[in-house]
Amino acid sequence: IDLTAIAQYVRFQHLLGVRTFFEDIQLLSPGSILIYDLTSGSCDTRAYWSFNEIPYAPTISFDEAVEESARLLDRAIKRRSKDDYAPGLFLSGGLDSRTILGIIDRRPIPTLTYGLQNCRDVYYAKKIAKAAGSDHHWFDLPNGNWVLENIDLHLDLTEGYHSWIHAHGISTLSSARQLMDVNLTGWGGGMVMGKRFIEPRLYSAVDDAALTTHFFYKFNQKYTWPAITEAEERLHYQQPLNDRLRGLAYDSFREELEPYMDFRHDVKSEYFYLRNHEWRLTLNFVNFTRSHVEVRVPYYDYDLFDFMHSLPAEFRMQQRIFRPVMQKMIPKLTKIPYEYDEFLPTTNTYVRSTHATMVKLKRRFNRHVWEIFPEYFTLYADYQNYLRDELREWAEHILYDRRTAEREIFEPSFLKTLMKRHLSRMEDATIGKIAPLITYEMMLRRFYD
């Protein structure tokens, strides 16, 4: 068992780089070829592509960048949807999937949305589907039973690298297989076109130490559910592992980040995020979807990716370039709010600011006067309450099981503390501290024992 992997999984809820859960086994690096020589019996890897090959275009104007990115995105989507296979789309209330739906030529195509009935994704996806004329299907996630029904499949397909609190969508795959041959996924849209996480403290950090400490905090607390903190880590492991694991996640994070410090200053954090969050965590959504349908990824079109990352990072921060592209290509869909903040993704400043003001006023009225305006859940799957209700017995059976304690990894008394905190409802987000531990134990039972 790789001890660094334990430390990383507990602090980030995924692993970094090419690391696996087991020593002397690693993933093939992205952009690499593995070569096995039959004569000598030697094995080697060779990189065929690097981020260094992306040119820098600091002199291009913003308007030129919008025009070219719109052209490349249009071509990327149409390249992947013009054959004889039936395309379909998982549609959320975000920007990435609606942009694909708005640009694709074939009509109507099936769209699928999963989530709680009164969540933002379900509400806005329905509006987007109606505006775009898609054949829309909604799948409810009213309780945690779907997790129990699909947990073994999810573990098999993701090998434990993806905790069960990221299994949403897997319960829809049998239906998706009947509706589409090819899923045109919006995965990577925010990464390529401009993610919210692009911020000055990352793309223009004052020095490497400032970047490292802030980035570690983001990976630990912000990019997914908040995970175990430094103080909690001191109570988390049994001895003698406690002394060996304490601080190991941070040390390995620094080591993994070090090679990226040589890349262009405004994009090196994005490249690290791509390889260590997108590839190691969110790509698992694509992986388990591929168990039922082919998945095509328009946003990771080579030409589009290279062009977008040749631009100054400021062009892509806060969807600065994405919204003009949408306004140019799918203006009708910019009139439907973005689920993240419920503001319009339009470039019309007056319309956007007026609408945003109304949204804020309604929220304040609901909060301070009288709750009369509808508000929608931000989460499509209520994993927190699943764990308190339908999943509680299952989770406690794993966490408190003799086999779990006898591994001498996690401190049994602290596992009970975490679960008590979660059940008390006194804290907003404790599930990111518990779910990875359950998944890790399940992984050991399936692949190690």
Per-range role (PLM):
Residues 117-177, 187-214, 222, 227, ...:
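ATP-dependent adenylate-handling ligase core
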Residues 44-46, 122, 192-194, 307-308, ...:
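Short helix/loop capping segments that flank catalytic or ligand/cofactor-binding pockets
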Residues 1-153, 158, 438:
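Cysteine-centered catalytic environments shared across enzyme families
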Residues 41, 188-190, 445:
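Short, glycine-/Ser/Thr-/acidic-enriched flexible segments
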Residues 23-30, 178, 223-449:
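Adenosyl-5′-phosphate
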Residues 63, 67, 71, 89, ...:
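Conserved structured core elements
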Residues 18-21, 167-176, 420-424:
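Short alpha-helical segments and helix-capping/turn motifs at coil-helix boundaries
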Residues 84, 180-181:
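Short, high-confidence coil segments that cap the C-terminus of an alpha-helix
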